């Protein structure tokens, strides 16, 4: 399986602008810039896209883990908070924190925790990141 996305950047780092697109078309010339990345201006940035990908990947991985334990989730809601810091080697993604809440009928806390931990380590996006990944997982009734 392969997935494809592209980016075009025009101009210098601080005064330039770019667009990002995905082969599916869900991202189509979506703008980004220095200010959307480092100054909290409205718009997207690479780190936000990584966080979104991680939240989506983890949610699907958790669903797979639960299904493998004969548990069917009603809902899984995941947010990913990515931390990027300037280190001696330059800007580095140092951590991602996953906050997940799930409704899973018939699940007990132990089974849910096992599924969540397996999803955290087994999610393909988790595997590609070298950052510390922490998690708060809540089973809701």
Protein language model regions, located:
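Extended beta-strand/beta-hairpin segments
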Residues: 1-52, 59-141
């Amino acid at each position: 399986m392969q997935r494809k996305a592209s980016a075009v950047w025009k101009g210098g780092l601080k005064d330039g602008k770019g667009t990002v697109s995905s082969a599916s078309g869900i991202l189509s010339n979506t703008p980004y810039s220095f200010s959307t990345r480092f100054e909290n201006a409205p718009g997207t940035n690479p780190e936000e896209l990584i966080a979104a990908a991680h939240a989506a990947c983890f949610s699907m991985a958790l669903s797979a883990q639960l299904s493998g334990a004969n548990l069917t989730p009603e809902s899984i809601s995941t947010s990913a908070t990515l931390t990027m810091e300037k280190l001696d080697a330059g800007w580095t993604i140092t951590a991602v924190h996953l906050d997940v809440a799930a409704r899973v009928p018939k699940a007990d806390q132990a089974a849910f925790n096992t599924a969540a931990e397996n999803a955290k380590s087994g999610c393909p996006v988790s595997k590609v990141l070298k950052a510390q990944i922490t998690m708060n997982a809540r089973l809701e009734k």
